[in-house]
């Protein structure tokens, strides 16, 4: 609908009253607008300072030709003073903003912006975009933070704006849904839609100038707008932290509720329940919801509200008299919240609440489209109308006779006689299982009642295998016997159709980027990886039926002779409690691995035959023809070898064996393993995890030599000094020396900042170099013998992530930092021999082009690989990719490629690159050319690993963030083998050639050993 002239006059008249208007902001004067909290200090921006900076940014936008009513996309790393002020400058420039995913590839970002009709983009810090799709217009420093402005290049015919109508007047922002209520949609939000929400919440929660609101919701999740605008509406203060809940809940807790009484804590906190739980019940009760905490309002939304049983573990009933604990509900389609309930009792069920604004209308529709007291909830409003092209441009858009526009929530609710609304479940959580319709939400609630208050459960449906999986989050690890007792108790309290096929125990549930329970990731963690058919049956028998494996075969034989009644694997499947329903489930899963359909049918018949013991079934599975890893692979092209002999030319066709990796063992580290894996002389494997656990393992069996529990998480690669001494950096800012065989701590040295960079032992074995995130000195040199500090210095203005590169011949180091600085430093005394600077940060560890070379390679995060001279650091050649580079580079100089070296690295543009590097005479020049690149289907953060496997030759191991792992031919980039781990992979692998095994950490909490 095109607004009339009167509407335009009214909207212009209302402009000064908008909560983000610069004059309104300036009126709050010296009131703090934003506090940026770090461990060392608070950076405070007042409303007056904010107004001045907004004016500067508005001039910057106008100078670069940004017109009124333009859409400006935001590609920002996190909430910072600069990003907040840029949003306000965009709005005051009569434009609207469009938050985007910072991890999105440039091509996808270009496509999304084109669909949204957005022509401009602002990126901050190290984030960049490909020049193929975007034109750089200019940059500006905002509180020492670089902000760059781009414009999309001319759109192709394939990229069309989605909306068929003009955008609403007074546009405020455009945002994409997460897909919770269906596939992701673009939502265009005018000011008139969000403003009443902010005014209503301000009144109901009594928000005032005295409040401090945590700005912690990601910019791509629309509740962040509520946090942001609540402060502007009331002159309250926003608080941001350098840490996130995904990074370190404990550090976020310390930032929000500091121990120092002189430092103010927050008063308003908005989170999803899943994210809030990550604080831990004890911290929630003692610090967040204690009577003495600064918190005044807690808003939990985006997911089902916690149960009364869980609430009791979080707070004393008296807290409800002091604080507003709120269930807040809404959908992005009516931005942002619609219903609010302030909890009055810890014993009563918590409803969805009542409308925040008076004009919000509720409607419940059942399956037959009749208005009912049970069914799907629809939210409607006369005033609060977002424009959703995908929906509103359809002829049958949902609107009743009164002009109210209704939006589906995708949630099933129940309305009681007094009008109170209660959440039931998601509408797509009802699935069909063996002819029965089952409700995942109902089953979850039934199982939750069987669990202690400290445990949490959710049920998942694996469509491909038609399997019901019950995930149980337990903070304390359980023995198999304890798990078995609990699962049988659960099975006795649900119907056969509701009984889970598998129970999975985890110590934490993963969250997506918006803080909601990530069910897709949870499913990946639960699906067994390449599990042998026998093990599938054994696991099912153990988890679901009354049959356990006999540990002592001789004892079982004696028992069978002494006792006529069969037991254990002498039982038939039916005697063990199996039904045809169970048999179908097992055959469906095992059948995916069977090559012959008749064998799958025969397995089903054996399971239902009461005269066939399980022992016989297991023997049959041992002989059945199975497809390894359930992946069909292309045949590897055969190599042709030509040779000569006395009788003439003979051509032999030699077929290289098809590569196949299988899992030999895996070890649970309880939390993510992002650290690179280290091996020592083929005898030890060592790695640390987010769980603070550091393990040294036997590479052949996975058995544990030692375990060390450090105070904080570990993302640093272990360095071995000897077989009895290794060292590792920790998030607590200390370097630890430990005995890998016993686990005893040998030394502990405080460095002053978290350590992600691998500590380096110099070639002469006399010094240890440690690079860190410390604020004062980010490079330390210690004596290897006594760990005394020999020298320390600071390079650049930012921390150091990359490991240093040693130049043994020059007795120097190359050190790269996160502000782009890179320096050559003398090992003997720490003197800086030269310093240069790239435009962007460096996460990638530099590497020499050859073992003895005048050239080293280094990669900027912005996607540029540079060849630099060792003598002065000057750039000799550059190769550019279209994505960020976090992977380190691996260099190889094969004897068959005379005069060439090859550099291999991963990129978040989903490609693995191999560059051909040719040096000129005297090593004074170099050429970098693309040798090959491979699309692996997902971003790559982990450093690739080179493997020599005979007779296949040199291979490249590559792991992507979605769990894909693959082996690639070094010569031509052809994929020789691929599979997928259950979780994301950020860990760099190691390879022991004699054992032909690869060791890699995964975000499903396991360290995997895969054998070739």
Swiss-Prot record:
EC number, UniProt record: 6.2.1.-
GO terms, biological process: amino acid activation for nonribosomal peptide biosynthetic process; fatty acid metabolic process
Source superkingdom: Eukaryota
InterPro entries per record: AASDH_AMP, AMP-bd_C_sf, AMP-dep_synth/lig_dom, ANL_N_sf, Beta-ala_Activ/Resist, PQQ_b-propeller_rpt, PQQ_rpt_dom, Quinoprotein_ADH-like_sf
Sorted UniProt keywords: ATP-binding, Fatty acid metabolism, Ligase, Lipid metabolism, Nucleotide-binding
Record has Nucleotide-binding as a keyword: yes
Positions of ATP binding: 177-185, 411, 426, 516
Molecular function terms, GO-annotated: ATP binding; beta-alanyl amine synthase activity
Pfam families with a match to the protein in the record: AMP-binding, Beta-prop_ACSF4
Family to which this protein belongs: Belongs to the ATP-dependent AMP-binding enzyme family.
Function description: Covalently binds beta-alanine in an ATP-dependent manner to form a thioester bond with its phosphopantetheine group and transfers it to an, as yet, unknown acceptor. May be required for a post-translational protein modification or for post-transcriptional modification of an RNA.
Protein name: Beta-alanine-activating enzyme
Gene source species: Drosophila melanogaster (Fruit fly)
